[in-house]
Amino acid sequence: MSLLSDLINLNLSETTDKIIAEYIWIGGSGLDMRSKARTLPGPVSDPSQLPKWNYDGSSTGQAPGEDSEVILYPQAIFRDPFRRGSNILVICDAYTPAGEPIPTNKRHAAAKVFSHPDVVAEVPWYGIEQEYTLLQKEVNWPVGWPIGGFPGPQGPYYCGIGADKAFGRDIVDAHYKACLYAGVNISGINGEVMPGQWEFQVGPSVGISAGDEVWVARYILERITEIAGVVLSFDPKPIKGDWNGAGAHTNYSTKTMREDGGYEVIKKAIDKLGLRHKEHIAAYGEGNERRLTGRHETADINTFLWGVANRGASIRVGRDTEKEGKGYFEDRRPASNMDPYVVTSMIADTTILWKP
């Protein structure tokens, strides 16, 4: 195994200028991630320098067998924490040979929203709190839980330490450092209320980069869980009963919200979000009705409610924002399995572009 490890960690720069680019895309479910690698003649610093590529869409549920070619357009580059050196991870979106975005390509529509002059002028910032659950591979049951049984009630696990309270920290810390190495604007991690559940935060990130960074952070996390022999779940309610679900709370502000008088802008934006509550819920992740019950720090899925420091609301405004009269708010409705391109662009569209 030591020879295998040595080969995996070979420093290519000592013998060649060539690099490895891992092209990453979203598969047919809209949540599964796929990737494959190719050799390039030398280091690359911008996606525009990368060639387009293709893959067999009939094997990912994204194209019929008789016309299976799907084209990958490179969109964002990150350093590769697995191969290191000058090797890169490449976030791509997917198109038909005719240049039309395929149905699971949500980035294309999001990029249109974020390139609108009114949105560009507002410099939208996002901070996304991505919750997830680590599962034992053979039994599909949270790590640290007795097989077929349950741990003690919730309470000691949130931000907890100790072998009886924190399960999977080695994966979490490896992911944290790998994201920092890759150039992801990861801002923190913490253990969650349900044991075996964790959270990482990405942001503040501007516009389309928020979606790119969440997707590559998810990719890095699943690669690490693959190495650890653990299953990664983004199910919004992985365990029935008196256990917290998993969300992707999305913190948001615009330039005018961050300036003096911004609190009034925030309140108007929240009013607009309330008017489109059903449309947002429909786009905020599958199975969210199992999570948004009005319990476990959620608002009921059919009710739109906002408040200051209220974690049982749809939208939470922080006390600092209220006190300073400017800042940001948190949309607590998105599920952990949401598409960040959809959620971020929809919030921008509703609060900046949409006219009720």
Swiss-Prot record:
One Pfam family from the record: Gln-synt_N
Signal peptide: none
Main location class: cytoplasm
Record GO cellular component, one term: cytoplasm
Molecular functions (GO terms): ATP binding; glutamine synthetase activity
Residue segments, region Disordered: 37-64
Gene3D superfamilies tied to this protein: Glutamine synthetase, N-terminal domain, Glutamine synthetase/guanido kinase, catalytic domain
Alphabetically ordered keywords of this record: ATP-binding, Cytoplasm, Ligase, Nucleotide-binding
Disulphide bonds in the chain: none
UniProt EC number: 6.3.1.2
Entries under InterPro entries matching the protein: Gln_synt_N, Gln_synt_N_sf, Gln_synth/guanido_kin_cat_dom, Gln_synth_cat_dom, Gln_synth_gly_rich_site, Gln_synth_N_conserv_site, Glutamine_Synthetase
Entry keyword annotation includes Hydrolase: no
Compartments where located: Cytoplasm
Record-annotated GS beta-grasp domain positions: 19-99
Reactions the enzyme catalyzes: L-glutamate + NH4(+) + ATP = L-glutamine + ADP + phosphate + H(+)
GO BP term, example: glutamine biosynthetic process
Domain GS catalytic intervals: 106-356
Oligomeric form and interacting partners: Homooctamer.
Entry's family note: Belongs to the glutamine synthetase family.
Name the record gives this protein: Glutamine synthetase cytosolic isozyme
Species name: Lotus japonicus
Primary gene name: GLN1
